[in-house]
Amino acid sequence: MSDLENLLNTGLMSNENGISPETRDLLIDSNFSQVVNYQEDTFIVTQGSEPDALYFTLSGVFHAISHANAQAPQRLLGRIEAGQFVGDITLFDPESTASASVKAMKNASTLKITPDSFKAFCETHPAQALELVSALARGLAARLRAANEKVL
């Protein structure tokens, strides 16, 4: 099974937990996204930089890491595995900077959606865009609940 086929059955891309097959197929269309492969130890997002895309993990594992300053040790915030996403904030707040770095822990691949592609998707497929945004919001809410549990 290919990385893309794996993604179709996991996380936000699965019909059970996220978006419909119709929306998924429209999103995967090459006009709206691209598959990008990464070598181990490659950063796809760097803390403090302007994020450039939403990334759905197809294969491999990424770590979200942060540090308070250049001298502080890195702190592991979480693992991002197949079916999970990062970079979502850039779609909703394009002026933001990345609050953490995201690093491939082994060879990995993602489905990358740029803000311009996301905007085009929203303009040409508004009903499916609403479905995608709702699924992203559920994913963000789940992250927030998990973060609250760690703090409390």
Annotate each predicted stretch with a short phrase.
Residues 1-152:
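Cytosolic regulatory regions built on CNB/CRP/Popeye-like sensor folds
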